[in-house]
Amino acid sequence: MATRAEPLAAAGAVGGREGQFVLVEWSDPGGLTNRERPIAGLHVHHSDDEAWYVLEGTLGFRVGDDEVEAGPGAAVFVPRGTPHSFWNAGAGPARYVLVMPPRLKELVEALHAPGAGDFAAIFREHASELL
């Protein structure tokens, strides 16, 4: 069983030079994350928007001061500059598509790289910040 959310497939980049974004399908096995142990802790992207589309299970989100749960077929959009975190809100597995610009895909890859060290520095390198 995985100890963190795992990428399942990447659809690659879509869009033109100015509006390019990446779709990546992820899964979380359930039982490992929750509000206190999120898939991604509270952070902010200063220059990039981000969105999720839930395929299976239930994800919980903190977006700014609000919390919401999203089930299959639901989408959550987080505009740049908005603090956010997310977690598997159910007991079972969750599958979702993360929609993000290439810079955020590079951030996720850097955070999951073997031997990734200073997470705060990695976030800063990608116009983002851990809170």
Predicted feature residues:
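Short acidic-glycine-tyrosine-enriched beta hairpin
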Residues: 19, 65-83
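Short glycine-/acidic-enriched loop or helix-start segments at secondary-structure transitions
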Residues: 63-64, 72, 87-88, 108
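Structural motif
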Residues: 51, 58-60, 67, 83, ...
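A short, compositionally biased micro-patch
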Residues: 47, 54, 71, 79-81, ...
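A short glycine-rich, His/Asp/Glu-containing loop-to-beta-strand
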Residues: 2-42, 48-49
